[in-house]
Amino acid sequence: MDWHFQGTNDDREHTKRIIIEYLNRIKAGDDSAREEFILRFRPFILKLVYKATDRHVEPENSEEYSVALLAFNEAINAYDEEKHSNFLVFSEQVINRRLIDYKRKNHKNKMVYPFSYFENEDIKLERTLSDADGNNAIERLEFTDEIRLFKSELASFDITFKDLLSCTPKHRDSRELLINIAKKIASNDGLYEKLKKTKKLPTLELLKLAKVSRRTIERNKKYIIAVSLILRSNLEIFKEYAAGIQEKEVDLR
């Protein structure tokens, strides 16, 4: 039975109940339930590894799969139904974070790029590839894949890199404010799923959570949406400055 399919509402509710039943058995100390649960979700874990690495892996010979498996176990142990309505969404977050951490540790001298770098992204992608050689070639290719993936995701919201260049706030305190708003979306499964489904910001909810004016949200909606997507993605190149801006001065323009 494929538990992570796109089915009807009744199918999804049934799947959710089964998952919760398994999680309750596992938390009660049923090791056999844990083993069966992990075995059934092995395709789900492998799919996330493939998305993160852009290649099929053999579980027995893949460090990335081992990292993802440990992360899935971590998600099982940490899952709280009151805080996260969907275990699959929660476990995907945990796995993606751990894979990103693993990748960072194994890729030194990772470069961080501002939005302005991608204003003419197709030209610069070509230049990036032509300059790549030796040990940097694979990393450069991964970099371009991340750009294309993010570009495609933005396009579904009718946002371009050029839009981001023009709408990124000039002042650091303004950027911090908007990133904090985006974090409220990214850390809330319900709000994030609503954003993805409607392609619009959950403005009413944000007015209550962020305590900012409607005008602030509406005027900066493209930037808030972009950062929300970054924070819930595998796009670690962009995450570097989306997260790091609050640690030191970083010009995102």
UniProtKB/Swiss-Prot annotation:
Induction: Autoregulated. Up-regulated in the presence of xylan.
Nucleotide-binding keyword on record: no
Biological process terms in GO annotation: DNA-templated transcription initiation
DNA-binding region range list: 203-222
GO cellular component: cytoplasm
Localization: Cytoplasm
Keywords: Cytoplasm, DNA-binding, Sigma factor, Transcription, Transcription regulation
Record comment: activity regulation: Negatively regulated by the anti-sigma-I factor RsgI6. Binding of the polysaccharide substrate to RsgI6 may lead to the release and activation of SigI6.
Motif Polymerase core binding mapped to chain: 63-76
Top-level taxon of origin: Bacteria
InterPro entries assigned: EF_Hand_1_Ca_BS, RNA_pol_sigma-I, RNA_pol_sigma_r2
GO molecular function annotations of the record: DNA binding; sigma factor activity
Described function: Sigma factors are initiation factors that promote the attachment of RNA polymerase to specific initiation sites and are then released. This sigma factor is involved in regulation of cellulosomal genes via an external polysaccharide-sensing mechanism. Recognizes the predicted promoters associated with sigI6 itself, xyn11B, xyn10D, xyn10Z, xyn10Y, cel9V, cseP, sigI1, cipA, and rsgI5.
Subunit-structure text: Interacts with RsgI6.
Stated family: Belongs to the sigma-70 factor family. SigI subfamily.
This protein's name: RNA polymerase sigma factor SigI6
Species whose genome carries this gene: Acetivibrio thermocellus (strain ATCC 27405 / DSM 1237 / JCM 9322 / NBRC 103400 / NCIMB 10682 / NRRL B-4536 / VPI 7372)
